[in-house]
């Protein structure tokens, strides 16, 4: 594990550059905010206000559930999850020595996929549990961990070559602000990859504690390609694409599992054909290629 370069970081409270204090914490230049290290991880969550409810929820969620083992014992789900990850890896640029940000890193699967290729990666989550697991799973001088909120990213602008947010956007309160936050940290010429369930019919149950309707899996939003692209500023829509994948019929008929031996590229062709002929994709991907020159902006649409 490597310590994140301080030059990459900003205070999530006042946007100032950070420095290491005599106490061994990260501190804003005016000394008004300090941020601790927990088990070697920088915790750059805002200090000026109490943590929002969603932050507390997902911190507790990470402590209770190990999503690295979520599909253990379910070979169909394991195969589906593997194909999702292959789809993301296939969308990465072919360049060498990329600097990537994994937003909501979970078990650290992306680290296992990209570090052997010589890339650098920041595994980021709102809890300390998941980045710590990711670093333990894939220790490397090119692997960094961070505890932070994607809505208040503590990075200097235009830092990353690639930002991946897989199965995250359906959970956030303000998807447009979420996308704008990610785009602001993406280099010109960089690539943003977002995946989410396709046109999900969100189901609710009655919470036994508050007696209010609560969405299953904490999914707050459902997206189609058009809805996902609408989150982008108009200037970036021409350089973005959104498409469905992971055909439902192939999953339910067990063909996805029976053909699990197929190479990733061959499977993607079969899946694309099934979605073209029969429809019913289960997942959605948006790829945004940020222009190398303006005029463009990364703010959320009004």
Predicted regions span which residues?
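Conserved N-terminal segment of class I S-adenosyl-L-methionine
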Residues: 1-156, 162-166, 176-179, 218, ...
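S-adenosyl-L-methionine-dependent methyltransferase catalytic module, highlighting the catalytic core
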Residues: 126, 130-133, 137-138, 173-185, ...
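Active-site micro-motifs of SAM-dependent methyltransferase domains
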Residues: 152, 170, 230
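Residues lining the SAM
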Residues: 166-169, 195
């Amino acid at each position: 594990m490597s310590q994140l370069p301080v030059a990459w970081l900003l205070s999530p409270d006042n946007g100032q550059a950070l420095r290491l204090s005599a106490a061994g914490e990260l501190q804003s230049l005016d000394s008004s905010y300090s941020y601790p290290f927990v088990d070697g991880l920088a915790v750059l969550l805002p200090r000026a206000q109490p943590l929002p409810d969603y932050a507390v929820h997902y911190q507790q969620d990470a402590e209770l559930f190990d999503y690295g083992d979520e599909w253990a014992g379910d070979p169909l789900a394991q195969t589906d999850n593997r194909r999702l990850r292959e789809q993301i890896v296939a969308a990465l640029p072919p360049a060498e020595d990329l600097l990537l940000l994994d937003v909501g890193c979970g078990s650290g699967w992306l680290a296992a996929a990209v570090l052997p290729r010589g890339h650098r990666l920041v595994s980021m989550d709102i809890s300390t549990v998941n980045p710590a697991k990711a670093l333990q799973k894939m220790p490397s001088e090119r692997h960094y961990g961070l505890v932070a909120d994607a809505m208040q990213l503590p990075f200097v602008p235009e830092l990353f070559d690639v930002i991946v947010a897989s199965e995250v956007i359906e959970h956030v309160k303000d998807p447009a602000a979420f996308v704008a936050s990610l785009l602001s940290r993406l280099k010109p010429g960089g690539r943003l990859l977002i995946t989410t369930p396709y046109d999900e019919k969100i189901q609710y149950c009655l919470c036994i504690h508050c007696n209010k309707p609560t969405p299953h899996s904490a999914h707050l939003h459902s997206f189609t390609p058009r809805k996902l692209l609408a989150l982008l500023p108009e200037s970036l829509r021409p350089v973005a694409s959104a498409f469905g994948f992971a055909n439902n019929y192939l999953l339910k008929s067990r063909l996805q599992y029976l053909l699990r031996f197929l190479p990733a590229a061959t499977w993607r062709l079969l899946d694309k054909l099934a979605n073209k002929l029969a429809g019913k994709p289960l997942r959605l991907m948006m790829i945004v290629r940020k222009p190398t020159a303006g005029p463009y902006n990364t703010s959320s649409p009004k």
